């Protein structure tokens, strides 16, 4: 502070009052005002949620363990509720499932807005959560996304700020500790339910000629260009695959998924979007590459990313085991 006074005095003597005002006083006043507005702890940015008594149910498990299903069933039975997903496709599927069950559900993904004035439920991408609306039950899916450099803030915001007395968090095992720390920092109660995979996942010891794929195979690459290229190669060998990638229009993607589900297309080529909650009859996952561009750099896949995608093989109730 003494050093600041010396700087101010020197400016006053050399450049006059107007310079002191613009160079010293205004920036100091702005910093002081901002410090009063910014909470010392992120949880304190959500006073309405802090005033509630919330109970969290953590559904912890790998892919294909039924953890999301458990939370979703509770959501549909509640008078009001919200489902938060990492992908617009998952939010759309959640809305369709609830509407088919007679639950009046709106949709908000940023790209698609389908709002019913009389809705009791909302399906949305994590970023679109309203912090003003209260719900009886909230389900936040794929909570391991909290560690994502670009989108993790949305899961932090949802967990700290959602206005619901009962909150279900569905997450991979590696996210458990950070989720518990967040919940404990809020003073909320919690319980942990561990979901185990019922179908074994086996790692093959040899490479696969992808032009000799078998029914139920999913070929994974990490770009739209890669998906279209691999799909075209398969067509050249007389195999018509379904395709999935992030920018594919919903109606087109839905048709592709239905084609794979009903057997019209026996193979599927996809980006890592397939790892996020899309329940498809996949027998074997084939990685076409082990690197991806994450928005910043091209890097090797992380172990948890490999597990998330590979876990889609061996859908429960359809195949006795999965292969990768």
Enumerate the language-model features and the residues they cover.
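Inter-Walker segment of RecA-like/P-loop motor cores
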Residues: 98-134
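Conserved segment of the helicase C-terminal RecA-like domain
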Residues: 174-175, 280, 284-324
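Conserved strand-helix element at the start of the C-terminal RecA-like helicase core
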Residues: 80-91, 169-170, 213-237, 241-244
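Conserved interdomain hinge at the start of the Helicase C-terminal
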Residues: 70, 75, 154, 196-233
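Short, small-residue-biased leader/transition segments that mark boundaries at the very start
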Residues: 2-7
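Conserved Walker A/P-loop ATP-binding site and its immediately adjacent core
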Residues: 72, 77-99, 175
